[in-house]
Structures are given as C-alpha cells and as structure tokens.
Amino acid sequence: MTYDELKTRIADYLNRSDLGNVIDSFIDQAESEINRKLRHKDMIKRSTAVLDNQYSQLPGDWLGAINVDLQTGDPVPLFQKSLESLDLYRNSIQNTSGQPKYFAIDGDTLEVCPTPDQSYTIQMTYYAEIPALSSTAVS
C-alpha cells in the first residue's frame, strides 16, 4: 500500500472527503504513538562511535538502549545508570578519567563515566524509530 492509498483508506473509513489536509497530521501522530510504544526485533539497530570525551551524540533515530559495549578485543559492557547516579559516581571517584564503566542518556546525548582516558570505540545496540511515511517516502 502506498502513502496515498493509506490516506484514501483513512478518508474512506471515516467516510469524509474533506479531511485531506489533516490526514497527514493524523498519520504523523499515529507514527509518533507507535514509536513511543512499540519495540520489535525489526527496530533493532547497531551503530559504532568513537568515544573520546564524556559526551557522545546518539544516532538520530535513537529510541532506547539495548546495550552499549566498549570494543576492546572482547566487548566490555557499559552499565546504564540514571544521570543522578552517574553524577554521584563521578563525584565519588573525584572526576578521574579511565576506561568507562557506566553510561546515562540525556536527551540525544550519551554520557559516560569515568571520562575516557583515551579514545574508545563503542558499539550501541538500540531500538530505532520506524522511518516516517510521506508523499516522497511511500513505504
């Protein structure tokens, strides 16, 4: 089914022909709701990044972490903490640098602790947003 066919079916289901302008908004809202609630194996993605400071940008389609590993020969898992717990831990080690052990998510940013003492490659396994439909991205 194409995007235009979906819009036609929605209008037919509602038995309204005057909703052409709001059906796009209806589809956007449905996609947002699906991305908030659905977690399916087909949404799982992997991404690597170089971690050389306390913060790293998350992928643009990030919904939630499954796991984050340092790629140092054998993968070394980083354990997720709340931002508050990460700050408390950072204070307890007097903000020393070292191999990261923990991570927290702050919006679109990954924060690690301790602050990396060198560049590390990390692999992030995460749930990704379902690509949005539009008149140009029809399936």
Question: What is the predicted function of each stretch?
Answer:
Residues 1-139:
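Glycine-enriched, solvent-exposed interface loops adjoining structured elements
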